[in-house]
């Protein structure tokens, strides 16, 4: 990867493999650090002779075909190595054995273990544990397939983004031009590019003619950059004589020598940097892991306690082991895995409808816990198309609308000066609308030409009608295209107005250069001499527009006198035979890539949600700061150090940096900063703009934010954003303007490229976190009425009140739909007004949730179930005290004369029917108390009466679980299949008082929380 390999020293021997295969990880880290460094190359400093010596290329004939073939064999094809993709089967296994699924697998294995112990020791073992094991395995496999399918669907959409067009490149070999596949281009090749081509490799330009390239995907500059053979800057990314792989040539032609191909290009290094970064664990995965620890802890603690207890109570070892396994399995919430998966999927679908495509389900929640967003400027915060913002004519600044439909244009369009200015802007302009777009709105039409000229073309077309007709009336005779030495563009046209001279010369260019060529100025349609006062007015206007971060162009014209330039005069542009001085200055037009309409509002929402928005851009500081102020990243009244210095009229060095809330950091300063200095900036400034940053620096900024403990979202569209996208906790790429590399690296894609969609994402993410809490609280509560019957069965030696099969009916049957319905619950308060959650303290499942679900609501539910159990047995003659210690006889199939409290004798078959009826009734009681639990889980702080019952899915869930319970109880044949028996209608009502008690208890608890915020009740029970 070392960059300064002089190619003259590049003997094949130097390409030996790494000698030592040891320390592979260390090497990888070293490579990553190497990639994070700035680009170092020296080809831009070499003279043409030195280039010829280094690459052995004839500068007019190119390489020989034989030499090219040799180099191709040595270096490999000129293509980026695709990032290593995870094989599908590994992705599938991750779904099957990741996190929560492991808990269920362990449960299933324990069940099979228990069953095999029973099968080995009993003559007619019960099949409950076998069923349970099979069901648990099935649950994991089905939910695994489901989430795998969800993610595979997103990656299918990803595949469709890949543009499979094989690129062609025009090379010169053996002195002949030939078009070859771009992958066959080799180092040392002589390549020609013209407007509209993609640059096939990193080129050192040796000759150019009006060549401009669009580097925005690499550096983030929205303006096309001039390319010429001149060495203009030490930094290879800034110099004019290097053109980069995969950027686009927008106009002109150039010829260059290939200096790097494939992965060794600047673009290739960035792509490699992105694919080599490991993304960390998502916040929701960490939460689920934390939750599993809690549940496992509770399960093992209960299991071991009762294992010891059952040994003390003189059960056999085998029985005690069966109990241990039973308790651990009873603690596993079987339905929860499916619930969480479905909730995340629903949110992902909801986000897709709002133009956010989520690539992996866990990223859905990450956006909700985001505390810092690092956003790219070009194309994300702005529209990525230059638009005319202001004009200066008649000695005053006029505003053009920069809204996306340009509705704000309200200046005097009848002024003679404006007519002259618009005429120059339309004629001295090579941009044209592409064919067949007459029925599209002007601003939506595609233009062939560079960004500034397109902006002028659209502006003039909007204000003055068809530019094409204007150009036909004023036919062009000759032109001098823009070049970097004289910094102007000029053309001479036939003038159709008979009252004026025949030829009109129009010129545009850098304002100070244009003004130097003028001796008069047009004011209100009259020419006046250009005096010092007007020059000052020009200077002030120029500075004001430049200070707004706008790109300013000057315009002037001259009517060529007929006596010197009669009709048919031969104008010569090489040996100029017409005046290019003493022209008449007409005005200035300034352009900017304006903010998207919805962005300021979105930034405001982020700020009120406690999210810090940082702008990270490759563009110039002045432009970056202007846009940051325009969209509210630097808010009204907040000053940078430079602003304070200017206001107090003191040097910048005397200002205390802590006084400035806002801060604009230049990439070159960032280069020399230590991590500590960067941390200081991130800590002490609330509003930050990083300008002129390289891709490597974007990555360093993200790492800096993460060191502060922030959860970072990064938005971007260029290749230059991809390393940062990959490193961030959640990378957000742009769907329309985004490059393939950035889409690969991101976790989420904004299909409409609109920054405002991120706010929607944050809102959905926060909502799903709240709703998952509610869902989990609901699901866990029924664990207590499921476990306690088993514990009492062991301790008090009573007939088993609730069987394994019935537990499954609750977890995978009646509780599923209600738990999922909580995902549709609306937010209780304004989610977007609170601070982001602290991942260290604000957990998905915390001790308070467990204590509320298990210790409070769950206990009331268990009481309801036992009450029903004792009522049914008492109605059948077994009073509660008589049941103590009855278990051994009750479960013995050879004893057929067990007596009840009234002396009646019961056979084994009869006893079991009563027991199974009790199981069914206990099950129904749990359903009844879960009604109340579902309703109270709708809110965590508000009263249910404030929240209302608008959630239709939840109401459906209530009816669905009741209907399912009734079906399981009364459907003929259930006695055989699930050992469920029909109940007397009165037995349904046993648990009603407990259901009501739960509702009242929780409403009172929430009332106290609302009345006494921060009090004891809130600290102990608010999850």
From Swiss-Prot:
The chain crosses the membrane at residues 88-108, 132-152, 289-308, 321-338, 773-792, 803-823, 844-866, 919-938, 952-970, 986-1006. Keywords: Acetylation, ATP-binding, Cell membrane, Cell projection, Ion transport, Magnesium, Membrane, Metal-binding, Nucleotide-binding, Phosphoprotein, Potassium, Potassium transport, Sodium, Sodium transport, Sodium/potassium transport, Translocase, Transmembrane, Transmembrane helix, Transport. The modification Phosphoserine is found at residues 16, 40, 47, 228, 452, 484, 668, 675, 943. The modification N6-succinyllysine is found at residue 661. It is a multi-pass membrane protein. Gene3D superfamilies: Calcium-transporting ATPase, cytoplasmic domain N (3.40.1110.10), Calcium-transporting ATPase, cytoplasmic transduction domain A (2.70.150.10), Calcium-transporting ATPase, transmembrane domain (1.20.1110.10), HAD superfamily/HAD-like (3.40.50.1000). The modification N6-acetyllysine is found at residues 9, 21. The modification Phosphotyrosine is found at residues 10, 260, 542. Pfam families: Cation_ATPase, Cation_ATPase_C, Cation_ATPase_N, E1-E2_ATPase. InterPro entries: ATPase_P-typ_cation-transptr_C, ATPase_P-typ_cation-transptr_N, ATPase_P-typ_cyto_dom_N, ATPase_P-typ_P_site, ATPase_P-typ_TM_dom_sf, ATPase_P-typ_transduc_dom_A_sf, Cation_transp_ATPase_P-type, HAD-like_sf. This is Sodium/potassium-transporting ATPase subunit alpha-1. The gene is ATP1A1.
